[in-house]
Swiss-Prot record:
Pathway where this protein functions: Cofactor biosynthesis; adenosylcobalamin biosynthesis
One cellular component (GO) term of this entry: ATP-binding cassette (ABC) transporter complex
A Pfam family the protein falls into: CbiM
Subcellular location(s) of the protein: Cell membrane
Transmembrane annotation, as ranges: 35-55, 66-86, 103-123, 131-151, 166-186, 208-228
Organism annotation: Acetohalobium arabaticum (strain ATCC 49924 / DSM 5501 / Z-7288)
Region forming the signal peptide: 1-27
The name this protein goes by in its record: Cobalt transport protein CbiM
Length: 251
């Protein structure tokens, strides 16, 4: 990657930050101490194997790939941090936020995003008081495991069906966002089924964010397509090296 491409990619960090970073930072993660100990432990145990495999994948990228690919990996992590730190108010009085995991999943596959998402969530829990360490397993499972795997799966499926690149990127990113919140609602419903049972509790928790999450997922999909277009223009070689696109493809 030449100096011009490095400059453009570094500029993207600041561009995304200027456009999206709010004055105050909030995140819709399950808060510290909110889950019962049993469920907090279950999600930690469920998350750890994914994290271990993700670390191996990231280690392989950092050891074998060139500076251009490493820059894209860093960009994917920054994209997750910025978007997942963005608060949007909900009509229910709570808040929602994008996840940003779709871009990295499309570029590198879902495994590295488990690690990047975990790092972001730890940073937010320790330094920004968003989420928590006891609930880290649950938050990682929803945002850094389910989200990236859904985004990557949807993207690859549409590519196999010869869908346009823009549609594949948009759909993968949007579905990754939506399934993250569905997973979070499911986690809360399992932990707090209430007197009416799991299904009623799930509907209640999903309803908390439904009014904002669908348009938010659409917005995240559009932003991801925009960033992907910029990467295609200035980092086409790296995208081909990652087998994200083939020669002659456009978004």
């Amino acid at each position: 990657m030449n100096k011009k491409k490095n400059t453009i990619l570094i500029g993207l960090y600041f561009l995304v930050g200027i456009m999206l970073f709010p004055d105050r930072i909030y995140a819709m993660h399950i808060a510290e101490g909110f889950l019962p100990v049993k469920w907090a432990g279950i999600w930690w145990i469920a998350m750890l194997p994914f994290l271990a495999l993700g670390i191996k994948k990231v280690k392989s990228i950092t050891q074998k790939e060139g500076p251009g690919i490493k820059m894209l990996l860093a960009l994917a992590g920054a994209f997750v941090f910025v978007l997942s730190s963005l608060k949007l108010p909900s009509l229910t009085g709570s808040c929602s936020h994008p996840t940003g995991v779709g871009l990295g999943a499309i570029l590198f596959g879902p495994w590295p995003m488990v690690v990047l998402g975990c790092i972001v969530l730890i940073f937010q829990a320790v330094l920004l008081a968003h989420g928590g360490l006891t609930t880290l397993g649950a938050n990682v499972f929803s945002m850094a495991i389910v989200g990236p795997f859904v985004a990557y799966g949807a993207y690859r499926l549409l590519k196999k069906l010869n869908a346009p690149n823009w549609l594949s990127v948009f759909t993968g990113s949007a579905l990754g966002n939506l399934l993250t919140y569905i997973t979070t609602a499911t986690q809360l419903a399992w932990a707090f089924p209430g007197k009416t049972g799991f299904i009623a509790s799930l509907i209640k928790f999903m309803g908390v964010f439904a009014t904002t999450q669908v348009p938010l997922a659409v917005t995240e999909g559009l932003v991801t397509v925009l960033i992907f277009n910029l990467l295609l223009e200035y980092s086409e070689g790296e995208l081909k090296e990652l087998s994200v696109i083939s020669k002659g493809e456009t978004v």
